[in-house]
């Protein structure tokens, strides 16, 4: 069970143009999707101008039939428009190089990225290993076997799990999990297990940090734990609108919501801008730093500074050997050999920053339930509460490990 295509250190390179928008390449090691692009508009473009641009693209596309290389099947053209808050407007589509060149020369376009493959971030699997992460979250010292917590914490809060789905019928969720939206296939189930494991750590009755939180499945990764960057952004857009009162943005609704993204890929300015729009809407988001033992600045959405980026620790309070690190990491959380939910009323033990991030998402829900203010500022609260525990956290990286403030 894996996460991410290895987020190799990549610097996005501008391929063109002098007068038009930059067309960004994710480098030779990124797994790009042929002819698929994400087009990001300038921040000051109005909704009316965005709609006019979409009409222009449609008219231009219809006048010039495009076919995929080696196939008689036509290209799709514009496929989905994104609008996250007032700051991020974009669309995804399938175009040939000539059409993309024309789009890049449009005055309203900021930049264009090739769409890339994104994967989940668990990296190892081991059966029947006792979990230690919960005890560590509720204690100032390592080595405990009891989780100390307030049993009302998390109630009234909703956690959106942007992942492979959730087995909503698993007994550990106690009826608090529901299906949200599927952006990757036609199976409204977790056929991979990654998302259910993550959700269990956020809010399972036995395995969860916030045992009263409501959980919503937002499926963006398939049975192999793989999806597209554009599909992930679709899930982010839907979750943001739901968290903000069904599209009618309200700070009160947003402040009672948290999100978890235990996934990622090579650095993507489009993904980072979408994540920032969610933070700007007043929603707390925890994301996995990545599992490549390198600087997380090269991964997205982990490299976006306005969200809470989580590295993984081991049971002895050392940095997990696979965990990414660097200045963009906000906090460490347990991520090595973590036991949680498996579809079919089972359990599984996994390792990865995928397992660390939901500890922080769950703690965010826990603290909101206790009356702490939600939104991106909650990451600062979590850092202030944390203990200086991590040994050798990595160059330029915080040594802070999450703690729920139980007093134990």
Curated annotation (Swiss-Prot):
Enzyme class: hydrolase
Domain Inhibitor I9: 36-119
EC number: 3.4.21.-
Cellular compartment(s): Secreted
Active site feature: 163 (charge relay system), 194 (charge relay system), 354 (charge relay system)
GO molecular function: serine-type endopeptidase activity
Family under the similarity heading: Belongs to the peptidase S8 family.
Identification of the protein by name: Subtilisin-like protease 6
Highest classification ranks of the organism: Eukaryota, Fungi, Dikarya, Ascomycota, Pezizomycotina
């Amino acid at each position: 069970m894996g996460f991410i295509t290895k987020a190799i250190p990549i610097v996005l390179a501008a391929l063109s143009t002098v007068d038009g928008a930059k067309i960004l390449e994710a480098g030779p090691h990124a797994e790009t999707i042929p002819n698929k692009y994400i087009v990001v508009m300038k921040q000051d473009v109005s909704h009316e101008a965005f709609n006019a641009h979409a009409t222009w693209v449609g008219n231009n596309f219809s006048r010039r039939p495009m076919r995929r290389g080696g196939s008689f099947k036509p290209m799709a053209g514009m496929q989905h428009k994104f609008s996250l808050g007032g700051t991020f407007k974009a669309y995804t589509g399938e175009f040939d190089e000539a059409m993309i060149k024309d789009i890049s020369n449009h005055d309203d376009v900021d930049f264009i990225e090739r769409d890339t493959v994104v994967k989940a971030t668990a990296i190892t699997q081991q059966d029947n290993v006792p979990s230690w992460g919960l005890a560590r979250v509720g204690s100032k010292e390592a080595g405990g076997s009891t989780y100390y917590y307030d049993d009302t914490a998390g109630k009234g809060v909703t956690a959106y799990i942007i992942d492979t789905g959730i087995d909503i019928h698993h007994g550990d969720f106690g009826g608090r999990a529901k299906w949200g939206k599927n952006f990757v296939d036609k199976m409204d189930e977790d056929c991979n297990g990654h998302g259910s494991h993550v959700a269990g750590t956020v809010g399972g009755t036995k395995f969860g940090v916030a045992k009263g939180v409501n959980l919503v499945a937002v499926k963006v990764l398939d049975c192999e734990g793989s999806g597209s960057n554009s599909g992930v952004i679709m899930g982010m857009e839907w979750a943001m609108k739901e968290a903000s009162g069904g599209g009618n943005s309200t700070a009160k609704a947003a402040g009672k919501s948290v999100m978890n993204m235990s996934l990622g890929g090579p650095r993507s300015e489009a993904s980072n801008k979408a994540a920032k729009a969610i933070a700007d809407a007043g929603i707390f988001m925890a994301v996995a730093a990545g599992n490549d033992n390198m600087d997380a600045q090269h991964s997205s959405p982990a490299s976006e500074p306005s969200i809470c980026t989580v590295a993984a620790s081991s049971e002895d309070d050392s940095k997990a050997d696979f965990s990414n690190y660097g200045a963009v990491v906000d906090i460490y959380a347990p991520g090595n050999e973590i036991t949680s939910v498996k579809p079919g009323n089972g359990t599984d033990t996994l390792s990865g920053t995928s397992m660390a991030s939901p500890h922080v998402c769950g703690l965010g829900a826990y603290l909101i339930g206790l009356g702490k203010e939600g939104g991106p500022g909650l990451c600062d609260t979590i850092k202030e509460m944390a203990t200086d525990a991590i040994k050798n956290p990595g160059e330029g990286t915080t040594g802070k490990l999450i703690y729920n403030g139980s007093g134990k």
